[in-house]
A protein has these predicted regions:
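N-terminal small-residue-enriched
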Residues: 1-478
Length: 478
């Protein structure tokens, strides 16, 4: 058996109670006589919103329950109940077995073998006093008052906080036994002011892996980030629109990370490959510049600094690192045990479920372009006429690899130097074409603090990368 217990911590009584469920889950899974995964799963979210000094929302939500997933004669059966009693566990297991009997069968092939993942991975703090609800409100009031006093020209100022923690105990008939609790903080500051031609806004996301004490305890640091955000907003209000058409650009790490996830990562998920993804018939082919190596990683990513952590997936498979593209060549896809068997690959721990009532799907974990050795100044200096895009907003990509994303912060590049700030624009293209155009890859890997993915179920992910120089289609004014 593989022992993945990388983060053992003294447990509080509630944690000990959840960890103590593992032997019961394991005993029932192993006594089932078929491939079985039993999971207790709880998600807790605290959210706060303040606008113009008025607290609009301050709430806590929690969902928890038990699920059973059975694989029998080539078909899965799944059942879930919002209860964690022994009786609920038996009922869920029985219903899952019944559902497996009723499911359509395309064949009776087995699941790909996988070593059982084991370990305790509780990342919640035990060494410091927690912020109380009242202290969180007071922090918001302090920040809002400071913003209002320093920047009276703002027409709106919004503060949004989300504290999220996913906690689960999982055991399988194959011997996997694992408990995890992974917290994350997302703090958004959005500012707007009036320019000559209308309202201009800009936001920044802070936080990441851990709890509020890890990210929001230093008010001076937060205010410094807000000062930088205001400076960017002021320049943007006086900024220029992009020229439309194909352009040489530098994508900062925030934009490169989203593209790695949305435009490339999804095309390499094996269920979408089977559905006709553009990546499906390109294994072993060059799909990117030799400077591009792109992977999906377990743990907290290759540098241990992602905003998300995962060591064992929801099928009980240990999370191994996967290089999807290596030096420009497409090497493999992301799998669960079912698609790994169908496509002759090894599962690496990509089966994930967002809530107790969700069945695991093939999902990304920590997806990023690995850093190179090209300084940012060299990228900018290599462009005569183009743009430096720093922050991406909403966007979309499809199975053909075509993408379009909004960009809300950037600068002109003229004769190898940064010029005017930019207004909102869009970038679009085909992912593999864009990656083939990459000529520079920066040396610094950074991660979005707020990565989420919405493939049927929302789920936390890590999205990262260095800055890259490439060519994309830019929206704007001719």
């Amino acid at each position: 058996m593989i022992d993945l217990s990388l983060n053992r911590r003294p447990a509080r009584s509630a944690r000990a109670e959840r960890v103590s469920m593992l032997p019961q889950l394991a005993a029932k899974a192993q006594a089932s006589g078929v491939e079985t995964a039993l999971r207790w799963h709880a998600n807790e979210t605290v959210s706060m919103t303040m606008r113009q000094g008025v607290l609009l929302a301050n709430q806590r939500a929690r969902s928890s329950g038990i699920s059973a997933r059975v694989f029998r004669n080539g078909a899965f059966g799944f059942a879930a109940l919002p209860d964690d009693s022994a009786d609920a566990l038996d009922r869920a297991l029985r219903r899952a077995a019944e559902n497996a009997e009723l499911a359509p069968r395309a064949g009776a092939q087995p699941l790909a073998p996988a070593a059982p993942g084991r370990g305790l991975f509780d990342y919640r703090r035990t060494d410091a006093r927690k912020f109380t609800a009242a202290e969180r409100v007071e922090l918001f009031r302090t920040l809002d008052a400071a913003i209002a006093a320093k920047y009276p020209d703002l027409v709106t100022r919004d503060l949004n906080l989300t504290l999220f923690c996913s906690e689960k105990a999982l055991a399988t008939s194959g011997g996997a036994e694992t408990f995890s609790a992974v917290p994350r903080v997302i703090f958004h500051v959005s500012l707007a002011l009036e320019a000559k031609d209308g309202i201009v806004d800009l936001y920044d996301a802070m936080g990441g892996f851990g709890e509020i004490e890890d990210h929001l305890a230093d008010v001076d640091s937060l205010l410094a980030r807000i000062d930088a955000l205001y400076d960017d907003l002021r320049r943007k209000a006086e900024g220029a629109f992009c020229e439309a058409g194909p352009q040489d650009v530098v994508l900062d790490s925030n934009v490169a990370g989203i593209l790695a996830h949305e435009a490339v990562g999804h095309t390499c998920e094996a269920d979408l490959v089977l559905a006709g993804s553009i990546a499906g018939d390109r294994l072993g082919q060059r799909v990117a510049s030799e400077k591009i190596t792109l992977g999906d990683f377990g743990g907290r990513g290759p540098d241990g600094r992602s905003s998300f952590a995962i060591h064992v997936d929801d099928e009980g498979t240990p999370c191994a690192d996967t290089l999807l593209i290596e030096k420009g060549v497409l090497k493999t896809f992301m799998h669960n045990r079912d698609t790994a068997q169908r496509l002759g690959a090894a599962p690496a721990g990509n089966a994930r479920a967002f809530a107790f009532s969700d069945e695991p799907l093939i999902r990304m974990r920590n997806t990023c372009i690995l850093p190179g050795d090209d300084p940012l100044d060299d990228m900018i200096g290599a462009i005569e006429h183009g743009y430096y895009f720093r922050r991406a907003t909403n966007g979309q990509a499809d199975l053909t690899g075509e993408f379009m994303f909004g960009v809300n912060c950037g600068r002109e590049i003229r004769n190898g130097k940064l010029g005017r700030a930019l207004r909102d624009t869009t970038i679009s293209g085909v992912a593999f074409d864009m990656l083939k155009s990459v000529t520079h890859v920066g040396p610094t890997l950074s991660w979005s603090p707020s990565g989420w993915c919405g493939k049927k179920q929302p789920i936390t992910v890590g999205m990262g990368g260095p800055a890259i120089k490439c060519r994309v289609h830019v929206g704007g004014r001719s």
